[in-house]
Curated annotation (Swiss-Prot):
InterPro entries, sorted: Ribosomal_bS18 (IPR001648), Ribosomal_bS18_sf (IPR036870)
Protein name: Small ribosomal subunit protein bS18c
Sorted UniProt keywords: Plastid, Ribonucleoprotein, Ribosomal protein, RNA-binding, rRNA-binding
GO MF, one annotated term: small ribosomal subunit rRNA binding
One annotated Gene Ontology cellular component of this protein: plastid
Length: 75
């Protein structure tokens, strides 16, 4: 049972080689934002903590430049 659990966690990397996290790469950033505009969790994104920090900064910068929408706070 422990072995199958370990194998189920192996996944393809969320960011392919040659792709860089940048605030100008909107198509990449949209993959890590929910429909409501929220940044998805690191567990959902399958990113390392360093990649998640860079991604968060890039998404926030894209929001400031109006490339991505801010999250909708209404229910």
């Amino acid at each position: 049972m422990n072995r199958s659990k370990k194998n189920s966690r192996k996944r393809l990397p969320a960011i392919r080689s040659g792709e860089f996290i940048d605030y100008r790469n909107i198509s990449l950033l949209r993959r890590f934002v929910s429909e409501q505009g929220r940044i998805l969790s690191r567990r959902t994104n399958r990113l390392t903590s360093k990649q998640q920090r860079v991604l968060t900064a890039a998404i926030k910068q894209a929001r400031i430049l109006a490339s991505l929408p801010f999250p909708n706070s209404e229910n």
